[in-house]
Amino acid sequence: MAKIPLDNDQLVGETLGLADSDVDFSDTDFLVIVTPLFEKPVESGATGARGFDVDGKSNFLVVTGPYGDYFEREELDDWLLHETGHLMGLQHIYDFHRAAGAFDVMGNYIVSDTASFNDFIGWNKFFLGWLSNTQVNCLDDSVSFETFHRLTPIGKNSPDLKLILLKLSESEALGIELRHRSYLDEIKEGDEGVIIYKIDTKILDGQGMIEIVSSPSETLTDKTHGSSVLGTMSKGERYLGFGYKVEIIDSNSDSSYVSVQRQLEP
């Protein structure tokens, strides 16, 4: 989480104090404070795990940011979504050019030269409770036979399967999901497909907790940040790694059919 300086704490405290006489915050979980364009800008950020107590509401979480971050910088149109992700407990999954690519708003925070895929990656949606148990298939090494799964796009609002998780250890797993263009996903039609990524919950904020491992030669080029991994897979492609074989059996406009099988050590 970003470290909030003392001046920012003072700004939030005074703002809440002034508004408290007119606003009942008892049913509020998050608050966004938009500041004027001061000569010395207020640092943008989220309070993270440490919040404020107002109207009997403890751990009151706040995002602050200058007016320009909302309305005058097109490349920061996902800024509020990114900071709100922190309020909900998500960490940075930087650095995106070698790790999560452009597939999560917590990792592609400032990507202005290529399409930003401003949705949350499946693991983060699962963490937030946005995916039900029926939308996630979890497997571990006790499943030795080949399994088949029909994945639907992570950004499509439907009750269908969205995510496959392959447990590697107590802190590690492989995530498999389908990315298609949607309201939040600005991925180009030719770049759509299945991605596979490694999750390691022991890796600290900003150190690459999520890393795309499928099709590492597939990249996007960004003028500011260089190449970032794309990693999408289409019909007929397969991935071998971490003791698993994952193959895309078929794909259409609505779904991809994926087979998963353990690869026994020789």
Predicted regions and their residues:
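Residues that act as N-cap/strand-start positions at coil-to-secondary-structure junctions
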Residues: 157-162, 190, 233, 240-242
